[in-house]
Amino acid sequence: MKVRILGSGTSTGVPQIGCTCPVCTSADPKDNRLRASAIVETEDARILIDCGPDFRAQVLHLPFEKIDGVLITHEHYDHVGGLDDLRPFCRFGAVPIYAEEYVARALRLRMPYCFVDHRYPGVPDIPLAGN
């Protein structure tokens, strides 16, 4: 098993826009962190944990490979704001979303166009698994 940390920053990322603290103004690359996300890989599957608004930037440098599912820890924007960027990965097939029911309800409200019966072309195929 391999765990790849895609981001370990706060909900606003680091550096935070407008912040003048020593970390946010540091030139050290270790002080430049995208929002929290990870990919867990085994021989059989690749599971994304959280898909925040930095997702596109987090995966641009990685090999373009199938994502077998996404585990969403909670419904805050910094953990779900990048779900629409899963569109290219749907070329491999549906990318199921795994989440608690309260998170699934929030996703249906936030992104209803993804979870209706008749989606328009190009909408990511990200069914809510088990719901």
Label each region the model flagged:
Residues 1-131:
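Binuclear metal-dependent hydrolase catalytic cores
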